[in-house]
């Protein structure tokens, strides 16, 4: 390579980009302004050396040897013994200390010297450094030993102080016992000479007795000479002797135990048991009767009998009991420190029949707690709910304008969906079964005035909860009223929902293109519902539209946009999303699907979602056209996939950071809901049981299993069908759910003899097999009208027939004749209807029934006839009744069977 090698050429030779080579040259300390400058051989070698040092390689073997000479590593191993205290003994432990030190000679130090060191000088320098290091290690070990010694001395000093305090307390206690014994002993007995053994036996127990300190521990008072005494005196003397000997021997044994275990902070289990046995074992002779009698009345350790005596409470103990939403009777009794039977008795006195394992609600538990004299406080178990609330507060941000949410409400067949069809330029109503809406439809439409989100609600009476849910989450309600029909029941209900939700109302008078349209009639009828048009001086906008030809639709959109501007709708566009579930269903291919309306934040794919008692991760988002948007902002309805189950329509949803929090919140909510449901379903109160016993006689039960395509339809069907129940028949929905009819549904229906209702769903093969083998009544429906009508028919068939009595004729008794064959025969005039033979009759006297029986004989001109009509005279013989009088009325009636209906 020549002297005229440029940077560009050098880069080509080493196969390196020019920019990278310039950077490496700059890092090596050489500055070049461009790739066309010349690189000398010296600069090349300098660059090569820099690159070698950068990659950890020496430039030459000589340099590598010099690098190795700059570094020296010393290994050292040292063995020593350490003594460790282990309870009462000391243990010696061998400790091996290993040290490894590496010394590196710095370049500055080497460059500052005039000449390199000789091997002897290097060895002397290394030995000096080793000696200094060894001295530092010895100083460190000495410092640690002094620290350990000071710590041990502090511990021993603390033990001595504790032992001195114990001895001081023990001395004070013994002095107090001796003073108490002196106060309790009779003074004359202690001062007088002992004429018998009883006073002599009491003498050693006196604190003023002189021989007590010199008396040996094993001495017995029985060895003293004593005069004979009565048996009762001997017993008393034995008791007093035992008590006195106990005091002295216990003191000696306590002293021995104290000396044996003194100065030990931690004792083993065996030592603790031995110390307890020494302190607690009875004194006196082993097996003596006096010792056994003394042990039965009081503890053998007199030092513990005083301070630990039982004191009777002077006031009732009032406990503060924390009660959650529900609590079992056993748990409540444990918190009250009472027996479970006492709590059950208290509940029974309050009229609540509950077992010890049964759950009761918070109000009932609080009442029984107050009844038992304690205080009840509400337990706060909403830990995960608080964390969820904190997440929601963290998501607050800057608010921006959002599109309005408009709910279309009105009566059936007044053109709600058709009006929305025209706005969207699509055909929705033709796709609904029967031409009526049975789901909440959520759509967002981009108009020239901005984005508007529409909610289309059903108008049928069975979908009351759907309409209420739509009015709750909306900003503006558009009330559609047909100009030819006027105000109908569901129209009034929609007005009530809008007023209850506090949202503004816009009335769209539809079908004005029909011949019988009368918009003025609609305005007048809505006046009764306090909906006053602007023409009449009110604040409600009335827009005349035609969903068929499109008349007035633009005016309606202008009115919606104007109302939205007045409301100044704002929401947080970024951050965690939150909103409400509009509808939910179970798709066989996609799993649980929830239609949600985002109210705050932005909902994105991959977010963790908690929705009522369900949770999950958003796997996909779909709009009403089937497209998958990247995210959904405020006031935008979307379908969410990925939840753990089908949520309830109307549940709120919120996005959280992780799946763990979502799962914990969902499980806590499910537990609370299950406990509340158990408490609500249990018939606890006595009056409810008695009422059910009264109603149960003769009441028929129709069991149903309801499966539908969406959660809203399930809810509407349950409410509508259960409302058909009366005193004669009860509609019982044993199971309901979303999705197709499965094998478990068929088994439930077979076990309870229920009818299966499939609303827009079908049964699978296994379910159909069970239905056929068990003869289960399975019916498919797509219109809610047909469901209600057929359930009414089935329920009416269970009711059977009703026997009714119909009066067919009345005869007036004019005279009474006597017959040897029939007895009293009434001569009558038929004044109403017809009287027939062999029909039941009633005899009325002064409009009061005096006899009910059967017509035995009916004659006219001595001839038997089958019937006698109005205005004709006849003779009537009443079977088994001879007390007929003139002026009575004979009422002839017949019993007919009438089918009972709901």
Swiss-Prot record:
UniProt-annotated stretches for the region Disordered: 137-248, 266-314
Family statement: Belongs to the TRAFAC class translation factor GTPase superfamily. Classic translation factor GTPase family. IF-2 subfamily.
Lineage: Bacteria, Pseudomonadati, Pseudomonadota, Gammaproteobacteria, Lysobacterales
Record field: transmembrane: none
Organism for this UniProt entry: Xanthomonas campestris pv. campestris (strain 8004)
Name of the protein in question: Translation initiation factor IF-2
Start-end of Basic and acidic residues biased regions: 137-177
Chain segments carrying region G4: 510-513
Keyword Protein biosynthesis attached: yes
């Amino acid at each position: 390579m020549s002297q005229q090698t440029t940077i560009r050429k050098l880069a080509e030779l080493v196969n390196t980009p020019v920019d990278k080579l310039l950077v490496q040259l700059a890092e090596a300390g050489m500055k070049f302004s461009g790739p066309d400058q010349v690189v000398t051989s010296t600069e090349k070698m300098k660059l090569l050396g820099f690159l070698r040092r950068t990659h950890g390689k020496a430039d030459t073997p000589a340099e590598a040897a010099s690098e190795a000479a700059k570094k020296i590593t010393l290994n050292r191993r040292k063995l020593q013994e350490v003594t460790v205290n282990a309870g009462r003994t000391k243990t010696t432990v061998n400790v091996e200390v290993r040290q490894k030190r590496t010394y590196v000679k710095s370049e500055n130090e080497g460059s500052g010297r005039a000449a390199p060191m000789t091997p002897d000088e290097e060895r002397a320098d290394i030995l000096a450094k080793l000696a200094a290091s060894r001295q530092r290690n010895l100083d460190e070990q000495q410092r640690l030993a002094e620290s350990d010694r000071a710590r041990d001395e502090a511990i021993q000093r603390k033990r001595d102080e504790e032992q001195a305090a114990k001895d001081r307390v023990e001395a004070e206690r013994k002095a107090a016992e001796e003073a108490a014994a002196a106060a309790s002993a009779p003074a004359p007995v202690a001062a007088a000479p002992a004429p018998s053994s009883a006073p002599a036996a009491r003498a050693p127990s006196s604190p003023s007795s002189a021989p007590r300190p010199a008396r040996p521990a094993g001495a017995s008072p029985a060895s003293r000479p004593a005069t004979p005494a009565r048996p009762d005196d001997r017993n008393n003397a034995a008791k007093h002797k035992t008590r006195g000997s106990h005091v002295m021997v216990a003191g000696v044994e306590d002293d021995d135990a104290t000396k044996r275990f003194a100065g030990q902070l931690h004792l083993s289990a065996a030592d603790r048991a031995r110390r307890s046995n020494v302190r607690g074992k009875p004194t006196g002779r082993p097996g003596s009767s006096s010792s056994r009698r003394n042990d039965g009345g009081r503890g053998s350790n007199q030092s513990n009998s005083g301070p630990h005596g039982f004191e009777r409470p002077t006031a009732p103990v009032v406990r503060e009991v924390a009660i959650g939403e529900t609590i079992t009777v056993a748990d409540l009794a444990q918190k009250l420190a009472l027996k479970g039977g006492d709590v059950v008795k208290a509940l029974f006195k309050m009229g609540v029949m509950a077992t010890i394992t049964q759950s009761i609600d918070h109000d009932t538990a609080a009442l029984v707690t107050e009844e038992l004299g304690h205080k009840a406080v509400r337990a706060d178990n909403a830990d995960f709910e608080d964390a969820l609330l904190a997440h929601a507060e963290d998501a607050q941000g800057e608010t921006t304008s959002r599109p309005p949410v408009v709910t279309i409400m009105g009566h059936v067949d007044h053109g709600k969906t058709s009006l929305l069809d025209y706005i969207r330029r699509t055909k929705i109503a033709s796709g609904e079964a029967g031409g009526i809406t049975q789901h909440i439809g959520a759509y967002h439409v981009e108009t020239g005035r901005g984005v508007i989100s529409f909610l289309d609600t059903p108008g049928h009476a069975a979908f009351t909860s759907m309409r209420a849910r739509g009015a709750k989450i909306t900003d503006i309600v558009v009330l559609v009223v047909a100009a030819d029909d006027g105000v109908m029941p569901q129209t009034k209900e929609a007005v009530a929902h809008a007023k209850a939700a506090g949202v503004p109302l816009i009335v769209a008078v539809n079908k004005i293109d029909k011949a019988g349209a009368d918009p003025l009639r609609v305005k007048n009828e809505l006046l009764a519902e306090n909906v006053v048009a602007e023409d009449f001086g009110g604040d409600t906008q009335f827009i005349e539209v035609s969903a068929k030809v499109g008349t007035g639709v633009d005016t309606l959109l202008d009115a919606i946009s104007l109302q939205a501007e007045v409301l100044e709708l704002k929401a947080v566009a970024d951050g965690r999303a939150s909103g409400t579930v509009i509808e939910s269903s179970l798709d066989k291919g996609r799993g649980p699907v929830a239609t949600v309306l985002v109210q705050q934040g932005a909902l994105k794919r991959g977010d963790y979602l908690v929705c009522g008692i369900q949770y999950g991760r958003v796997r996909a988002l779909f709009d009403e056209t089937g497209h998958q948007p990247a995210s959904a902002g405020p006031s935008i309805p979307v379908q969410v996939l990925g939840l753990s189950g089908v949520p309830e329509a109307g549940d709120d949803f919120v996005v959280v950071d992780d799946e763990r929090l979502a799962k914990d919140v969902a499980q806590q909510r499910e537990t609370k809901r299950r406990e509340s449901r158990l408490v609500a379903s249990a018939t606890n109160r006595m009056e409810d049981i008695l009422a059910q016993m009264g109603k149960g006689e003769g009441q028929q039960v129709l069991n149903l299993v309801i499966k539908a395509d969406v959660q809203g339809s399930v809810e509407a069907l349950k409410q509508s069908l259960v409302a058909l129940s009366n005193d004669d028949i009860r509609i019982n929905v044993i199971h309901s759910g979303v999705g197709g009819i499965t094998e478990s549904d068929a088994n439930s229906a077979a076990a309870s003899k229920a009818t299966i209702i499939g609303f827009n769903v079908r049964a699978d093969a296994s379910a159909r097999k069970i239905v056929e083998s068990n003869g289960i009544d399975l019916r498919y429906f797509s219109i809610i009208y047909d469901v209600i009508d057929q359930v009414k028919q089935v329920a009416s068939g269970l009711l059977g027939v009703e026997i009714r009595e119909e009066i067919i004729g009345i005869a007036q008794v004019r005279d009474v004749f006597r017959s040897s064959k029939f007895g009293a025969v009434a001569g009558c005039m038929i004044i109403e209807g017809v009287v027939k033979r062999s029909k039941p009759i009633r005899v009325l006297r002064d409009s009061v029934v005096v006899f009910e029986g059967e017509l035995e004989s009916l004659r006219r001109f001595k001839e038997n006839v089958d019937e006698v009509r109005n205005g004709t005279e006849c003779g009537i013989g009443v079977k088994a009744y001879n007390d007929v009088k003139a002026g009575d009325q004979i009422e002839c009636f017949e019993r007919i069977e009438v089918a009972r209906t709901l």
